[in-house]
Amino acid sequence: ITGMIQRQLFPDEYDNVDEAVLNAAATYGTNVHASIEDFDKNWNNDGTVEVADYIEICKEHGLVHEASEYIVSDNKNWASMIDKVYRVSDDTFSIGDIKTYGVMTSEKLEKARWQLSLYAYFFELQNKKAKIDKLFIIHLRNKIKKDGTVDHINEVIFVNRIPSEICKELLEADLKEENFNNPFSIPEAVSYT
């Protein structure tokens, strides 16, 4: 799903980013995900600031962990893993995605909104009696910057769900190898010269 979102909606996002920077960011993100998953599955707190921040966020927002790396699919063409599923009630759940970006740009926020909305669509498709309550990013970071200061971020960012019909249109366009006409994109500036 993330590759399709990248291809259809954000094809130029990483064009000017050094590969070593991308690899370092991916390694850091993978390590944070693994630490948090170990806490949720095994109650193992590895002592990292990110896990401590995650525990605090769960307490502050009343998050009741239901599943990590939960696989969702349309049972035909698409499958992906939801970072975190939290139980709200017997039939209601919220979905969280862990991000470790240094800066949460508007583009990254919109990308996560699409990702979470597609996850919500698939989750409800595969769990007919379930409904999704909230979608949010768990933004965690604790890295030393080049100047020696610590880049410490621990926040929850709620996103508005994109309607399932629009999510389906995106998926169908990609399957047909067509460009998706994003109804949420901001038009290019027009020059009057």
Q: What does each model-found stretch correspond to?
A:
Residues 1-79:
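Metal-dependent nuclease catalytic cores that hydrolyze phosphodiester bonds in DNA/RNA
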Residues 192-193:
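Conserved small/polar residues in nucleotide/adenosyl-binding loops
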Residues 66-172:
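Mg2+/Mn2+-dependent nuclease catalytic core
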Residues 178-187:
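Charged phosphate-binding loop/patch that engages nucleotide di/tri-phosphates or the phosphate backbone
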